[in-house]
C-alpha cells in the first residue's frame, strides 16, 4: 500500500475531528450536492435532503442496482515484474470510451502498460462461485497521461477495443463518468469503495465509511486530496471512491498510518496498541497497522492536471483523452451519452429474447483472423542471429512425399515470417501443419509476459482451408479434457524478447494456427523435459552468451492414423543450436513420442499406458537421424557441430542430466 506523505499531527487531529463530524447544513453546498445527485441519475426526493445532512441513513433500493452497474467498470490489473515470475497488482476503472484510470504506482509508464493484463468480472456470483472473467490489453499508443506517485499519482491509459479472445467489446462494461466540478460530497457523509484488495475477488467497502477531510484551501498541495475512513488493502490502489449517488469523488491512492515520534524517529501505532519503527511497520501486513484514514486524489484536481499536461508543448495528443477532458469539464459530453450521468453503460439484464440470441451466438465458434497487412515488416527467423550463420533448412525428397509447402501471399518464397520466428507449412489437406519452425532465442533479453486467454488466429497470407483450426480440437467426449491440445511448435516464450512492444508482438504471433499441432493433452501439458530443453541448453553452454536458434516440427510418417480428416503425428523433433564464448557452434537433436496416444485413438475413455515424460519416451538422437527420418535437410554446419556421440538410433532420456551437450 502507498503511504501518505503528509505526516504532521495537524492532519491527524483533523482526521479525528472528521470521524465525529456530521454534514454541515450549508444551503448553498447542500443545493450543489442535490444538483450533482440529480445529474448523476440517482433520483432526488425529500429524504435525500435528510440523508445529506445526516438525519437519516436510508437510500433508495436502486442504490444496490446502481452499485452493481458501477462495479462492472472496475477491474483487476496485473503488471508482471521486470524479472522473475512475480507480479504487481492493483485496481482500476473505466472512465470513458476505451479509457482506464489507476495509480501511477500501479502503472507508471507506457512500457508497463503494454505488459499489463486488465481483468474484468473477477468476482463471485450469487451462489458464491467465481464468474467467468474477461481480459483486455492496454494500448498506451492510443492515449497515455500520468502524474508521478509523489505528485497526484494517477495514470490515464487507453485500453484495447476488444478482449484478448476477441469476443467481448470493452463497451459492454460501461464506464464511470468523471465530473471536474466540486461540491459532490462533504465531511461527515458516507464513502463507498469498490476494489480488488490483495488481488482478491472484487469487494465493496460500504460500512462505517465517512469522508473525514476534504482538501485544504490553505495548502495547495494538500488541497489535491481527500481523506476518508474505509477498509482497503494492498491491491486496492487505483480504486474508485464513490458518494451515495455513485459519483466518483476521488481515486484511492494511499493510507495514512497513526504516526508517533519516539526518540526523534518515526514510529507507527499497531492494532495491538504497540508501536514499531516506520521502516519495520511499512513491511508488516496491512491489518497489523492502525490506519487513521485513507487518502484519495480529488477528481477536480486530477482533471485539471490532465488538462495542464496535454496542453504542454510536444505532448502526444490523444482524441480519447481530449474527449475525456471535454466531457469532465462540461464542454461536450461523450457521444451518445446523457451529460452528467455518473454510470454509463448497458442495463444489467437484457431482454430474454436478446439473451437467447446472445447465448446462441456465443455457442457458434468464432474464426479469428488478422487484417491482410498485419504481418507486414516481420523479419522472421534470422540466419545470422548466432556468430555462425545457419540458414533455414530445405525440404528434401522424403519431406515432399508428405506434401508440398503452402504458397505465402506477398512472399518470394514459402516462408511465413513472424516476430523472431518463421514457419514453413505443409499444404497437404491431410496434414495442414508445419513442415518445420525456426526461432531465434535471446535468453538475456527475455520478457516476462503473462499468458492471457489463448486465442488462436488464422494467418491471412494462406487460405484458411489449409490451416487446422478449432474443428480439429474441440467437442471430444473425454472427461474434462479435449484429447488433443493445441500444441505450440515454437514455444510461446521462446521469441518473447526485446523491447516490450516487440516482445508482445512475438507472444501474439505464436498463437497462429500455422504454429499449432495436435498434441495429446497429457504430453502437451506435462512434458517438462521436452519443454525445458531450450532453457537447459541455453544456460548450460555459456554464462554470458545465452542465445540459441531452435528448429522443430512433427515427424510425418506413412503409418500415421487419421482423426477428423487429419493424419496425427506420432513423433515430434527438435534441433537446438548454441554457441559458446569462443563462437564455437554446438548442436543437438531430440525426438519425443506420443505414439501411444496417436494410434487407436480411444475417445470413449481416458488414455492409459506410459506417460510421454517417462523413460523411453524422450530421446536424444543424431541430427543426421532427424534429417533421414523427416526429409528436412539442414546445413552442413548443423551436422558437423552435433554434440551427440551415442548410438545412431538415439538414447532415451530420463532427465536433463542424461543430455549429451557441451559442458561449461
UniProtKB/Swiss-Prot annotation:
Superkingdom of origin: Bacteria
SMART domains found in the cross-reference section: Endonuclease_NS, NUC
Pfam families found in the cross-reference section: Endonuclease_NS, Trypsin_2
Species for this entry: Sinorhizobium fredii (strain NBRC 101917 / NGR234)
Keywords: Plasmid
Keyword DNA-binding appears in the UniProt entry: no
Protein name: Uncharacterized protein y4fB
MF (Gene Ontology): endonuclease activity; metal ion binding; nucleic acid binding
Keyword Membrane assigned: no
Matches recorded under InterPro entries: DNA/RNA_non-sp_Endonuclease_sf, Endo_G_ENPP1-like_dom, ENPP1-3/EXOG-like_nuc-like, His-Me_finger_sf, Non-specific_endonuclease, Peptidase_S1_PA, Peptidase_S1_PA_chymotrypsin
Amino acid at each position: 500500500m502507498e503511504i501518505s506523505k503528509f505526516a504532521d499531527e495537524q492532519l491527524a487531529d483533523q482526521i479525528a475531528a472528521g470521524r465525529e463530524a456530521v454534514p454541515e447544513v450549508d444551503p448553498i453546498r447542500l443545493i450543489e450536492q442535490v444538483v450533482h445527485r440529480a445529474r448523476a441519475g440517482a433520483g432526488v426526493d425529500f429524504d435525500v435532503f435528510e440523508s445529506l445532512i445526516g438525519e437519516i441513513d436510508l437510500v433508495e433500493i436502486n442504490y444496490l442496482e446502481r452499485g452493481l452497474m458501477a462495479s462492472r467498470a472496475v477491474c483487476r490489473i496485473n503488471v508482471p515484474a521486470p524479472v522473475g515470475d512475480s507480479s504487481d497488482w492493483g485496481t482500476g476503472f473505466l472512465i470513458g470510451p476505451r479509457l482506464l484510470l489507476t495509480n501511477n504506482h500501479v502503472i507508471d509508464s507506457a512500457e508497463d502498460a503494454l505488459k499489463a493484463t486488465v481483468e474484468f468480472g473477477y468476482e463471485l456470483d450469487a451462489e458464491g462461485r467465481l464468474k467467468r472473467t474477461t481480459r483486455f490489453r492496454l494500448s498506451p499508443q492510443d492515449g497515455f497521461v500520468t502524474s508521478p506517485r509523489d505528485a497526484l499519482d494517477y495514470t490515464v491509459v487507453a485500453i484495447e477495443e476488444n478482449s484478448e479472445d476477441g469476443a467481448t467489446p470493452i463497451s459492454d462494461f460501461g464506464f464511470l463518468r468523471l465530473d471536474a466540478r466540486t461540491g459532490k460530497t462533504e465531511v461527515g457523509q458516507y464513502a463507498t469503495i469498490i476494489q480488488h484488495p490483495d488481488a482478491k475477488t472484487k469487494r465493496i467497502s460500504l460500512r462505517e465509511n465517512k469522508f473525514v477531510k476534504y482538501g485544504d484551501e490553505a495548502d495547495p498541495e494538500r488541497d489535491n486530496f481527500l481523506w476518508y475512513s474505509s477498509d482497503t488493502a494492498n491491491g486496492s490502489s487505483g480504486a474508485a471512491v464513490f458518494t451515495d449517488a455513485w459519483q466518483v469523488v476521488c481515486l484511492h491512492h494511499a493510507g495514512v498510518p497513526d504516526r508517533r515520534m519516539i526518540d526523534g524517529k518515526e514510529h507507527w501505532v499497531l492494532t495491538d496498541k504497540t508501536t514499531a519503527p516506520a521502516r519495520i511497520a511499512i513491511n508488516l501486513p496491512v491489518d497489523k497497522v492502525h490506519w487513521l484514514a485513507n487518502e484519495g486524489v480529488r477528481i477536480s484536481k486530477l482533471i485539471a492536471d490532465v488538462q495542464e499536461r496535454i496542453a504542454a508543448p510536444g505532448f502526444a495528443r490523444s482524441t480519447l483523452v481530449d474527449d475525456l477532458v471535454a466531457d469532465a469539464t462540461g464542454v461536450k459530453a461523450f457521444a451518445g451519452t446523457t451529460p452528467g450521468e455518473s454510470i454509463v453503460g448497458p442495463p444489467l439484464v437484457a431482454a430474454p429474447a436478446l439473451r437467447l440470441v446472445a447465448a446462441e451466438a456465443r455457442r457458434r465458434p468464432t474464426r479469428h483472423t488478422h487484417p491482410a497487412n498485419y504481418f507486414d515488416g516481420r523479419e522472421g527467423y534470422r540466419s545470422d542471429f548466432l556468430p555462425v550463420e545457419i540458414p533455414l533448412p530445405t525440404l528434401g525428397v522424403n519431406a515432399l512425399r508428405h506434401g508440398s509447402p503452402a504458397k505465402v501471399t506477398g512472399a518470394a518464397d514459402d516462408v511465413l515470417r513472424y516476430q523472431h520466428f518463421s514457419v514453413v507449412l505443409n499444404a497437404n489437406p491431410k496434414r495442414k501443419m508445419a513442415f518445420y519452425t525456426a526461432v531465434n532465442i535471446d535468453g538475456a533479453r527475455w520478457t516476462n509476459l503473462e499468458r492471457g486467454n489463448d486465442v488462436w488466429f488464422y494467418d491471412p497470407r494462406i487460405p484458411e482451408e489449409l490451416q487446422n483450426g478449432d474443428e480439429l480440437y474441440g467437442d471430444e467426449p473425454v472427461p474434462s479434457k479435449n484429447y488433443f491440445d493445441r500444441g505450440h511448435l515454437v514455444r510461446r516464450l521462446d521469441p518473447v524478447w526485446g523491447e516490450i512492444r516487440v516482445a508482445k508482438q512475438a507472444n501474439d504471433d505464436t498463437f497462429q494456427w500455422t504454429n499449432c499441432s495436435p498434441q495429446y493433452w497429457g504430453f502437451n501439458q506435462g512434458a517438462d523435459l521436452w519443454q525445458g530443453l531450450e532453457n537447459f541448453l541455453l544456460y548450460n553452454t555459456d554464462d554470458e552468451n545465452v542465445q540459441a536458434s531452435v528448429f522443430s516440427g512433427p515427424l510425418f510418417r506413412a503409418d500415421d492414423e487419421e482423426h477428423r480428416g487429419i493424419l496425427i503425428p506420432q513423433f515430434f523433433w527438435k534441433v537446438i543450436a548454441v554457441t559458446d564464448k569462443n563462437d564455437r557452434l554446438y548442436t543437438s537433436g531430440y525426438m519425443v513420442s506420443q505414439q501411444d496416444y496417436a494410434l487407436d485413438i480411444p475417445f470413449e475413455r481416458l488414455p492409459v499406458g506410459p506417460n510421454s515424460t517417462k523413460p523411453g519416451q524422450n530421446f536424444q538422437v543424431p541430427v543426421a537421424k532427424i534429417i533421414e527420418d523427416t526429409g528436412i535437410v539442414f546445413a552442413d554446419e548443423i551436422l558437423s557441430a552435433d554434440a551427440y556421440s551415442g548410438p545412431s538410433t538415439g538414447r532415451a532420456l530420463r532427465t536433463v542430466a542424461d543430455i549429451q551437450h557441451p559442458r561449461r
